[in-house]
Structures are given as structure tokens and as C-alpha cells.
Regions:
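Compositionally biased linear targeting/interaction segments
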Residues: 2-3, 16-546
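N-terminal secretory signal peptides that target proteins for export/translocation
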Residues: 1-13
Length: 546
């Protein structure tokens, strides 16, 4: 038997060392794999958590839109609800309560506050589309018989607007294919483009259609406010260094979309949906009976309004006195023809002969103020004085608010395109016929400031009707009556932005929406995700400590 030599013994020790080294390497690799796996799992956990938080923020923002619609619906039964600027109601509303600030999700309903050249802090609330000029009404300016009414002058205060663009808009809206307007464009121009399309030749169905109109560029349409927050941000005031292209003049140039709309609309019905009393009703006897039967109006009101329709206001100037519309005149002619044929007997109310056709109509219910009519009552010439006098401003405010709820001058279910004098910008105010720069500046000057705690409720309580322009001395009565058909302090189509956000960290979702309250219940008609444009508002504004 041979003895194992030293070399063999050394080889055995080497093998044991080699195994130990292999085991060590394996353990190191396993540890590295474990660490890598744990890191990957941690990354996956963070990604999953962030994804979940992103969903929470989005759900919060969408909840904010539904909450806004609910508050608009509540406003119908409780007009005291302030949806213009109400931080208590719309600012940092929690979705549930949690102890961990990083897990507390909220929504804030905001509207960019375009109160200066640099913008301002956002309002906590909504704005009505009646704060803008309804571009579909532009064609009315051209068809108006008043020589002082000019389409370009109406929108010339909108930044970037030109005569050529105005003419192109008119060509887009009118029903013909005539190209006699300087700088205008009809379907033939658009159909020759690389991607052809035709002019609408009718009312626009979306304000975005302006981008199809010749001469309207994205910069003109959107302006320099790239992230749509209403604030002049550094990248919006640095020339061509960063998008958007701007002129670096220290002024935030807003776009057409901030001044123009196609959605401004108001309900022309009572809160329950019943029809208002139309004081331009072609059948005057029917109008009289509706007025007389109303418990809040009665015989004297019915007599005066009927007398006005028969003979007109003796105190009115030529521009403020309403004439019969074509439809009204046709109805009057039909009634007169049948009376002369003996098919309709004599019709009288309160001693007034309603067999004679009416000669006047109302441009707005404000024509009633300080009016005076001369009418035969029982065959005796009689002077009737308006029950609504401008001598007592406080009383007139209450009376006009009541009349606005009950009376109308139109049969239509909706009223389109009036301008909210409490919220419209100077550029939009100047679109109204008979508006002057001095009047527009005074309206802006008298608005309460937007503060963190809300607008001045006491001041706004006296401005529930456009009549405040008269009672606070902004305009005289003849001017107010001429402006009357354009004036409102309401609007039933609302626009807003909603942020879904956390108290600490986390993603933010920003949505833009439009809510149509001319329908019951109010309906969300438009929603757009603005998250890709960034948070938009300084995080300090949303800090729960503020």
C-alpha cells in the first residue's frame, strides 16, 4: 500500500478552499440579487403608489366638477349661494379626512383672474360664459339698421383683432358665398388648402372653430398664457427663449378664446320651467290678461304696459324706443285685417280699445322705467305714468329684480349673448353698442377686489341686476335704456378649472370644464385635461396652512 504524499494532502486542502470560495461567491451573488430584487420591489411599490395617488388626484378633480354642478343646481333654489368667488365652498375641499398630510387629497375649483396685465391670484369659483362676447352675434352688427353699429368696432378692443380677421369671421358666419369683404374668405379659399374644408356659413358650434378662420393663428387664439393660469409666468415673458413665443414686454397678452365664446346663454323661463310673461306678445289682450292675473303685478301694471304697447313712451328717445319686429308686425296686420272684415269683434281691457294694432315694443324691460304713455281710456285721452321710477334707487333695484324673474321681451326658451357687466373684461364691455371707454372704465373701477376671504358680499348684494349702473350713477337713463338689451348679471353656462391635489407632495390633476345649467339638472358639456400644461398655480396657493 502506497502512502499519500504531501502533494496529495495539499491538493485536498486546495479543494476545500476552492469550495469555500465558490460558496462565498454564490452567497455574494445571492445577496446582490436579493438587494437588487428588494430595490426593484421598492421601485415597483413607489411606482404603484404614485399610480394610485395619480388616480386619487384625478378622481378628486372629477369629483370637483360634479360638486360644482351640484352647487349650480342648488343655486336655483337658493340664489344666495355665491359661485363667483367663494373660498369656503370651493377652496381645498377634502375627499375624506386622513391623519397623514401626504395622503390627504383635495380638490380646488379655480378660475384664472385676469384683472391686470400680469394677471392675478385665481378666484375660488366659476365664471359664466356671459363674461365673454358671443361671436355668433357679430353678424347682427352688420345687419343692424343703426349706422353707428359696426362689427369691427365691436371687437376691435380684443388684442390682435384686425379688420381683415373680422371680415373673415363674418364670411365664416354668413350664409352666402360672397367675397366682397376686404380680407374675407369663403369656402373656395378653404377648399383650396392642403387639407380642405368648407366655411361654416352659419353659427359656430365651438369657439375652437376660430382656428379654422383665415388669419387666426394659434398665438392669436391662445395668447401668451401657455399654461392657461391667467398669470404672467417667466417662460411667457422671455421672448423666443422658451415656448410660447412672446414679445417679452412684461404684459400677458390673452388670446381670442379669453374674450370670445359661442356658449353664453341664459334660461328665459321661471325657475320651475314655466314661461315668463312676454310683454312683446303680439296678441296684446292676451298679454294684458296674463299681467292682470299675476298676483304680484295686477291691474295697474297691466294697464300701463298695455298702454305702452299701444302708443309707446312719450319720453323715449328715438334710439331707445322699440319698434315692432317683422313677426309682430305680421301678427298685427293679420289681427287688423280680421277686425276690418268683422271676423273679430271689438276687444277692450280697462277701457282701452285693443282692436287697434300696437305701435311699440320693448327692447328690454328697462324701457318701463320713468316711461309715460298717452292712451284713450273709455274714450278719454289719459296720461299714464310708469310705476317704476328712477328717483328711488333702492326700491327700483328690488322692483327690477322681481320683474326680471317674471317678464321677458322674447318668446325664445333661451337668451343668447348678453354680457355680464359684473364679470366681463373691459375688452368685452366695449363690444356693446353705445358703450364708451369712460363707462367701461367706471364699471371695472367699481368692482370689489378679489380677496382670499371672498369678494365683498355686501357690495355684490346690491348688484343682482344691471340696474345698478343707473342707481349708482354710472350711466344716465337714456344710455341705460340703449344698453339694456345687452345687459345681464347672470348666465347659465359656467366654465371653471379644477385641481385634484395632495396636502404634501404627490401628483396634481388639472381639468377644465363647462357646465350647462340651462338644462335640469346641470350637465357637463365639455371637459379637457390640462395636466400636461403643468400644475399652473403656485403650490403656496394650495398650501393647507394658507
Amino acid at each position: 500500500m502506497r502512502k499519500q504524499g504531501p502533494a496529495n494532502a495539499l491538493t485536498g486542502k486546495g479543494r476545500r478552499g476552492f469550495v469555500l470560495m465558490v460558496i462565498t461567491i454564490i452567497l455574494v451573488l445571492l445577496a446582490a440579487a436579493t438587494i437588487a430584487y428588494m430595490g426593484q420591489m421598492q421601485t415597483e411599490y413607489k411606482a404603484s403608489s404614485m399610480f394610485g395617488r395619480d388616480i386619487e388626484a384625478r378622481m378628486a378633480a372629477e369629483s370637483g366638477i360634479e360638486f360644482a354642478a351640484a352647487q349650480i343646481a342648488n343655486k336655483e333654489s337658493d340664489p344666495s349661494i355665491d359661485v363667483f368667488h367663494n373660498p369656503t365652498l370651493f377652496y381645498k375641499r377634502p375627499l375624506g379626512e386622513v391623519d397623514n398630510p401626504a395622503g390627504q387629497v383635495r380638490f380646488s375649483i379655480l378660475v384664472p383672474n385676469r384683472t391686470s396685465d400680469q394677471g392675478g391670484i385665481p378666484r375660488s369659483g366659476m365664471t359664466t360664459e356671459n363674461s365673454k362676447f358671443n361671436i355668433n352675434r357679430l353678424i347682427e352688427f352688420e345687419n343692424d339698421t343703426d349706422e353707428d353699429t359696426d362689427p369691427f368696432m365691436a371687437i376691435s378692443y380684443v388684442p390682435g383683432m384686425t379688420q381683415e380677421i373680422t371680415n373673415a369671421i363674418l364670411d365664416w358666419l354668413d350664409t352666402d358665398d360672397s367675397t366682397d369683404r376686404t380680407g374675407g374668405a369663403e369656402s373656395a379659399v378653404y377648399e383650396a388648402l392642403a387639407v380642405p374644408y368648407s366655411a361654416r356659413n352659419g353659427p359656430m358650434e365651438s369657439i375652437d372653430e376660430l382656428l379654422k378662420v383665415q388669419g387666426v393663428t394659434p398665438l392669436l387664439f391662445y395668447g401668451e398664457d401657455a399654461n392657461r393660469n391667467g398669470i404672467l409666468d417667466p417662460n411667457e415673458d422671455d421672448g423666443e427663449d422658451r415656448p410660447p413665443g412672446d414679445n417679452a414686454d412684461g404684459i400677458l397678452d390673452f388670446g381670442f378664446r379669453d374674450f370670445l365664446t359661442i356658449s353664453s346663454r341664459e334660461r328665459n323661463r321661471l325657475p320651475g320651467g314655466e314661461e315668463k310673461i312676454n310683454i312683446n306678445n303680439g296678441i296684446v289682450a292676451e298679454m294684458h290678461d296674463f299681467l292682470e292675473d299675476d298676483a304680484d303685478l295686477g291691474t295697474e301694471v297691466a294697464k300701463f304696459i298695455t298702454g305702452y304697447r299701444l302708443t309707446g313712451d312719450q319720453n323715449a328717445d328715438s334710439q331707445a324706443q322699440g319698434k315692432l319686429t317683422i313677426e309682430q308686425q305680421q301678427l298685427v296686420d293679420w289681427i287688423a285685417k280680421n277686425i276690418s272684415n268683422g271676423e273679430l269683434g271689438q276687444v277692450t281691457r280697462n277701457g282701452m280699445d285693443l282692436s287697434q294694432p300696437p305701435t311699440a315694443s320693448f327692447r328690454s324691460i328697462y324701457d318701463l322705467i320713468d316711461a309715460q304713455v298717452q292712451v284713450d281710456i273709455g274714450g278719454v285721452p289719459t296720461t299714464l305714468t310708469s310705476p317704476w321710477s328712477s328717483s328711488d334707487g333702492a326700491a327700483l333695484m328690488e322692483q327690477m329684480i322681481a320683474l326680471e324673474r317674471k317678464l321677458t321681451v322674447l318668446n325664445d326658451e333661451f337668451i343668447d349673448g348678453r354680457i355680464n357687466i359684473n364679470t366681463a373684461s373691459r375688452e368685452v364691455l366695449m363690444a356693446m353698442p353705445d358703450m364708451t371707454e369712460a363707462i367701461a372704465d367706471k364699471i371695472i373701477e367699481l368692482r370689489p377686489p378679489i380677496m382670499a376671504g371672498g369678494a365683498s358680499e355686501q357690495m355684490m348684494a346690491t348688484r343682482l341686476s344691471p340696474i345698478w349702473l343707473l342707481t349708482e350713477g354710472v350711466v344716465d337713463l337714456p344710455t341705460f335704456k340703449r344698453l339694456g338689451p345687452w345687459l345681464t348679471t347672470g348666465g347659465d353656462v359656467y366654465s371653471l378649472q379644477v385641481l385634484g391635489h395632495f396636502d404634501v407632495g404627490g401628483p396634481t390633476t388639472r381639468l377644465e370644464a363647462m357646465i350647462d345649467a340651462t338644462q335640469t339638472p346641470p350637465r357637463v358639456t365639455f371637459q379637457r385635461d390640462l395636466t400636461g400644461l403643468g400644475r399652473g398655480f403656485d403650490p403656496a396657493i394650495l398650501d393647507p396652512a394658507n
